């Protein structure tokens, strides 16, 4: 696939115009093109008349020809979709993996594990969203703080009560997969294209719930109000974690505890 960047058009322009300009910029005949699509879209309002700025994805019928067209176009680059496959290890797990924390990292880790048949156990120190929202509202109204159910802790993590902007500066190609998963669980479909994707807090709560439901549907288990309290190591390897006064045997654990769980640190 080729990405053609910096396709600038008036606000009134439609996607087909962006595709045509991208092919013209790339100097590739339409007859060689298998598919065109919008990879990213933003608005540049910095200088005078605002412009739409597209990044257009172009797939040729003969992928082997793509490098030659890219070489003569400074605004073009080759792009391959990141592999979002969870690769199995060489040794079978005796016990289910444990994911500690149900914020963004824990949600996606548990979702991938569940989709691949690992039946993860998720430990979340806070409550499910409905109870968490009630606790936050109570705090706002009365000042009564539940240390495990608040803006920081609970299903969805701290970002659940932000304004829903999805911001990253890492440029990781896996970001596209993350946006697609969010859209598949109820986020606006256009976040996969927008340069500044925005879900919105009201929608984000529903997205988080739907992701949790898929985890459970695929054999995962979510234990709310169950903080990680300890780990057990034998012969240099993890053998169990402690939570809710019991040992949970496991060989693998994902510590997705965020930055505010000081007692866990």
PLM feature spans:
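Residues forming the flavin
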Residues: 1-50, 56-265
């Amino acid at each position: 696939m080729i990405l053609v960047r910096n396709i600038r058009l008036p606000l009134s322009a439609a996607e087909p115009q962006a595709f045509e300009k991208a092919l013209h910029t790339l100097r590739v005949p339409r007859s060689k093109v298998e598919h065109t699509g919008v990879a990213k879209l933003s608005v540049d309002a910095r200088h005078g008349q605002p412009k739409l700025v597209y990044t257009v994805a172009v797939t040729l019928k003969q992928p082997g020809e793509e490098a030659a067209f890219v070489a003569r176009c400074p605004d073009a680059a080759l792009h391959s979709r990141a592999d979002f496959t969870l690769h199995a290890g060489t040794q079978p797990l005796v016990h289910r993996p444990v994911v500690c924390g149900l914020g963004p990292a824990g949600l996606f880790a548990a979702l991938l594990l569940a989709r691949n048949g690992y039946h993860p156990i998720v430990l979340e120190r806070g409550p499910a969203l409905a109870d968490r929202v009630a606790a936050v509202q109570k705090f706002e109204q009365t000042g009564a703080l539940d240390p495990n159910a608040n803006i920081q802790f609970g299903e969805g993590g701290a970002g659940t009560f932000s304004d829903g902007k999805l911001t990253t500066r890492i440029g990781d190609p896996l970001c596209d997969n993350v946006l697609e998963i969010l859209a598949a669980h109820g986020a606006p479909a256009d976040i996969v294209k927008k340069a500044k994707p925005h879900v919105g807090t009201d929608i984000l709560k529903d997205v988080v719930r739907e992701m949790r439901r898929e985890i459970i549907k695929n054999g995962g288990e979510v234990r709310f109000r169950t903080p990680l309290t300890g780990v057990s190591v034998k012969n240099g390897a993890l053998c169990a974690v402690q939570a809710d006064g019991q040992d949970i045997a496991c060989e693998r654990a994902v510590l997705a505890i965020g930055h505010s769980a000081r007692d866990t640190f």
